Amino acid sequence: MSATKMNAQEIIKFIADAKKKTPVKVTFNGELHGTIPWSVVKLGNVLFGDWEEIKPLLVNLEENKTYVVEQDARNSAVPLLDKRDINARIEPGAIIRDQVEIGDNAVIMMGAVINIGAEIGAGTMIDMGAILGGRAIVGKNSHVGAGAVLAGVIEPASAEPVRVGDNVLIGANAVVIEGVQIGSGSVVAAGAIVTQDVPENVVVAGVPARIIKTIDEKTQQKTALEDALRTL
């Protein structure tokens, strides 16, 4: 599913202009009186909607006036992505904000956090607890390891985002700093902190990350991806 690609200025405007909402689920006993706004959904004795619109309804709740409120955000500007029609595997607990583009057969694992404007290529896996900041771009058939961070750039608007090429492996807990580009076919070792651009088909490691060798057959075997994990 393709989102409308937005540059930094458009994302900033999107957030600034968005109506800030506190989405809630309210389960209640008793009878509601008064008109329910069109934006509030009522299913039996459960209400879904913005707290600012639901709160006045509860004042008119008759009988025992018992209700429970469930919420996970306050004055949120960016909703979560509607994942229903995305042709990818997205596991429970992944947090993906609106205006994110996810390619076919990508895999998003539990606990991954993907911010507004990020792009994930077809067949790419974002592993458990990895973070893709705003506007971060990952190419096709790559792997971002567990706990890795691709730094986001929303402000300043002139800054360049992180760009990761195709067939790249980023090891667990690695960090890629704002504006860095990782060339296709390269490997970033676990725990590395990448502060400069990385050319294609090399291995980088360390803090700060430095090139330690070019990709050879042994490295390719160790870092090969499993297509079966991307089958839907």
UniProtKB/Swiss-Prot annotation:
**By its UniProt entry, which SUPFAM superfamilies does this protein fall under?**
Trimeric LpxA-like enzymes (SSF51161)
Q: Which keywords does UniProt give here?
A: Acyltransferase, Amino-acid biosynthesis, Diaminopimelate biosynthesis, Lysine biosynthesis, Repeat, Transferase
Q: Does the keyword Repeat apply?
A: yes
Q: Any idea of its EC number?
A: 2.3.1.89
- Highest taxon, organism lineage: Bacteria
Q: Name one GO molecular function term.
A: tetrahydrodipicolinate N-acetyltransferase activity
The reaction(s) annotated as catalysed by this protein in its Swiss-Prot or TrEMBL entry are:
(S)-2,3,4,5-tetrahydrodipicolinate + acetyl-CoA + H2O = L-2-acetamido-6-oxoheptanedioate + CoA
Pathway the protein acts in: Amino-acid biosynthesis; L-lysine biosynthesis via DAP pathway; LL-2,6-diaminopimelate from (S)-tetrahydrodipicolinate (acetylase route): step 1/3
Give the matching InterPro entries.
DapH (IPR019873), DapH_N (IPR013710), Hexapep (IPR001451), Hexapep_transf_CS (IPR018357), Trans_hexapeptide_repeat (IPR050179), Trimer_LpxA-like_sf (IPR011004)
A GO biological process held by the record = lysine biosynthetic process via diaminopimelate
Indicate the enzyme's highest-level EC class.
Answer: transferase
Q: Which family does it belong to?
A: Belongs to the transferase hexapeptide repeat family. DapH subfamily.
- Function text: Catalyzes the transfer of an acetyl group from acetyl-CoA to tetrahydrodipicolinate.
**What's the name of the protein?**
2,3,4,5-tetrahydropyridine-2,6-dicarboxylate N-acetyltransferase
Q: Which organism is it from?
A: Streptococcus gordonii (strain Challis / ATCC 35105 / BCRC 15272 / CH1 / DL1 / V288)
Gene from which this protein is expressed: dapH
